[in-house]
Every structure is written in C-alpha cells, then in structure tokens.
C-alpha cells in the first residue's frame, strides 16, 4: 500500500467479452483508493506465504528473497523456486502436484505462467533497487506439465 491505494488481483475474474479492441482478456486487477487505513495489513510478515526455504535455495541475496516471497500469485500458490549463488539466480516455475488452492485444475498452468512473470518483475525491481547489475536470460518451457521448469537465469555482474 502506498498513498492509501490498494490493489487486488482477480486471478479467476470473469468477463463477458473475451476480446476488446483486438486484445485478448488475460487477467483482471482492481485498484482503489482506500479511506480507512485499518483495512490494510499493518505487517506484511503476517500474511500467508511459503517459508523462505520452500522457495529459495542458497545463501545469496536473502534480503531480496525475503521481499520477493511476498509477490502476489493466484490463490497464493507461489509457483516459483530460486537457486541462488554469488554470480547467478536461476528461477524456476515450480508446480507441486496437488497444490492449487481453489483454482480449477485446468487453469493452474495458465495462471502460474502469469504468476512467474510477476515474480520476475519483483526480482528485477529488487535487484535494481539494490543497484545490482544483471543480465537476464528467459527460457522457453519445453514441457509446461513438468513439475519444475527453468524460466529465467540472472547473471549477476
């Protein structure tokens, strides 16, 4: 929350029109000015998120890890896993079988791919905020049904 503006990601939002002005519907987000600060979470660390050890392997860039673990995801599935070393971050889209929250099974892969893109954005924002120079390589998933897919590699300069 900044300046009393709140956002909510409607991961399973539905629209009447699947296309508008030649653009396909992808995702829905609500943005609103909130006049009552009590409606905001005061301590982000009290939100329901996976433990750091479930999403981050390695002892590097833990200050960044402790922020990016709060990246929003559909139904809080947090479908990512990072392997960290001094000179590299490897980001995987990780799908634990059977874990999908309330999300319909046929939508898991679709929303998890959007989630991983949002996660990459958070990583890059944190790297930039910490003045950490990097080169990103995106990887095409060969088989989206795999439990773990390499999505991006960040070479730290």
Summary of predicted features, one role per range:
Residues 1-157:
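Acidic, surface-exposed loops and disordered segments
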């Amino acid at each position: 929350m900044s300046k009393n503006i709140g956002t909510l990601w409607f991961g399973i939002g539905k629209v009447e029109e699947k296309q508008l002005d030649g653009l396909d519907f992808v995702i829905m987000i609500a943005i609103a000015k909130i006049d009552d600060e009590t409606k905001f979470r005061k301590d982000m660390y009290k939100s329901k998120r996976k433990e750091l050890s479930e999403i981050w392997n390695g002892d590097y860039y833990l200050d960044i890890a402790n922020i990016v673990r709060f990246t929003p995801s559909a139904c809080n599935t947090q479908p990512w896993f990072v392997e960290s070393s001094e000179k590299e971050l490897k980001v995987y889209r990780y799908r634990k079988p059977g874990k999908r929250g309330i999300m319909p099974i046929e939508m898991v892969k679709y929303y998890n791919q959007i989630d991983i893109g949002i996660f990459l954005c958070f990583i890059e924002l944190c790297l930039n905020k910490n003045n950490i120079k990097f080169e990103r390589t995106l990887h095409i998933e060969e088989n989206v049904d795999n439990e773990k897919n390499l999505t991006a590699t960040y070479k730290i300069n």
